Amino acid sequence: NFFHNLFFPIRFTNNLLQLKFQNSAEELGRFLVNTIWGIGGLMDVAKSELQWQAHSEDFGQTLGFYGVGDAIPVVLPLLGPSNLRDIVGLGGDYYLSPLTTMGDNSIKYKIPNNLREEFALETVYTTNKASLRLGQYESLKKDALDLYPFLRDVYAQARKKQIEE
């Protein structure tokens, strides 16, 4: 929950760019409620008490919203299946992420303050995200005759559905 709350700028901005103004407003509300009453985002009070759902959008989906095709499928080490559009989208999300060292370097107590701190925070985030999905990968492996094309197709279909929503 903490990391989900922390990545509010990515979801908020991409909802705005996709002209999903209601979703943007709900993301802003979720961020404020979870930051104030959810102890800095450790608890998801907006979902448990107010039934406000998260609207996860990223820059890859935003590019898809504006008609950019998925192009070449790629498998990224540790990150799994992706495509050229979503890899470009990672750059946009990286710029918006509060865990990056980009932006105003005159902020005295900015975290992360250097690349080492950024790498450590991203590692914790990625490990946490992966630990929440261990069972999904094992169940997919059981259902696949050939894992690579199966994962590629599952990813492509899931992204297409996310962009259409």
Predicted stretch roles:
Residues 61, 66-165:
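A structured, mid-to-C-terminal "fold-capping" secondary-structure block
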Residues 1-84:
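Mid-length scaffold segments of soluble, non-membrane domains
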